[in-house]
């Protein structure tokens, strides 16, 4: 089921239906910039391919089921956004307390996890086919360490597992239905704001604030809700690597080239 926004665009009424709609979107959904001209652009369809591959990995390799605990301990990155959305796709509970699955980039981040059964080692490099760090160094932090980049491409492009129930919790005391309702409300604000470039052109993308990170369950939820809100508003998500010391003019030029704008914060 879908409803109509005031602009006439159809808006999926559940998270599962939103994912279905996103999978048919040919226009950009996620744009990532990092050092040395690194640029990743994912259409809605390609983003959902990555999300669904990751969700299948979580289910088939890590035995993650709806309601099972999942933890992200990593900075903002296009791959951590994918993994966070994959956890929602599966219906996981975002919880740091002895999660079944955790995901990290580094050994330092692994030290912040709490005895996961499975630890996903994720690499930052844009075209990494495997983890370039020391997998052995991560082995003391989990029962099993898995190389996310080496494994994820082998999984199906369409999610084949169980879909989450809207009444299930995504955080303790906070359901999937409540989370999606919050994302819809924020999306409506973004949709009606009429964001535009200084030239007057309509903005095609909104910047995901570099203040977001995946270092606590609540922080992960906040970041994912913002991603969902931007996508639901009809914009792409623009992410500039927060680990880079961007010069104002450099970042402004990148954003202008993508017709992206910063979301004003009160």
Language model segments and positions:
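Conserved ATP-dependent adenylate/AMP-binding module captured primarily in the ANL superfamily
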Residues: 93-114, 127-137, 141, 188-204, ...
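Conserved AMP-binding/adenylate-forming core of the ANL superfamily
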Residues: 30-64, 157-214
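Polyanion-binding and phosphate-handling cores
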Residues: 13-23, 31-35, 45, 52, ...
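Flexible, low-complexity linker/hinge segments
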Residues: 4-13, 108-116, 120-202
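Conserved AMP-binding/adenylate-forming
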Residues: 57-93, 97-98, 195-235, 239-241
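Long terminal accessory regions outside catalytic cores
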Residues: 1-11, 34-40, 46, 55, ...
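Extended, compositionally biased accessory segments flanking or bridging domains
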Residues: 2-5, 16-42, 48-49, 142, ...
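Actinobacteria-biased recognition of intrinsically disordered, low-complexity terminal regions
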Residues: 1-26, 249, 257-258, 263-266
């Amino acid at each position: 089921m879908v409803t109509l926004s005031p602009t006439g665009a159809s808006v999926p009424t559940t998270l599962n239906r939103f994912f279905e709609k996103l999978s048919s979107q040919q226009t950009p959904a996620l744009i990532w910039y990092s050092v040395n001209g690194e640029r990743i652009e994912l259409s809605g369809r390609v983003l959902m391919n990555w999300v669904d591959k990751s969700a299948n990995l979580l289910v088939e390799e890590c035995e993650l089921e709806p309601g099972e605990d999942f933890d992200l301990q990593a900075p903002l990155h296009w791959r951590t956004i994918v993994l966070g959305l994959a956890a929602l796709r599966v219906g996981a509970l975002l919880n740091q307390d002895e999660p079944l699955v955790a995901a990290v980039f580094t050994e330092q981040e692994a030290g912040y996890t709490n005895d996961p059964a499975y630890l996903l080692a994720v690499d930052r490099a844009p075209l990494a086919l495997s983890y370039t760090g020391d997998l052995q160094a991560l082995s003391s932090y989990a029962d099993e360490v898995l190389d996310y980049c080496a494994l994820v491409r082998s999984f199906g492009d369409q999610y084949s597992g169980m879909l989450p129930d809207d009444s299930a919790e995504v955080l303790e005391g906070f359901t999937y239905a409540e989370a999606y309702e919050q994302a819809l409300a924020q999306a409506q604000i973004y949709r009606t704001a009429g964001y535009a470039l200084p030239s007057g052109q309509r903005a095609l993308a909104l910047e995901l604030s570099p203040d977001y990170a995946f270092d606590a369950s609540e922080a992960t939820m906040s970041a994912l809700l913002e991603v969902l809100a931007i996508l639901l508003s009809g914009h792409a998500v623009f992410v500039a690597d927060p680990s880079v010391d961007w010069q104002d003019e450099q970042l402004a030029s990148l954003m202008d080239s993508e017709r992206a704008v910063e979301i004003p914060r009160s």
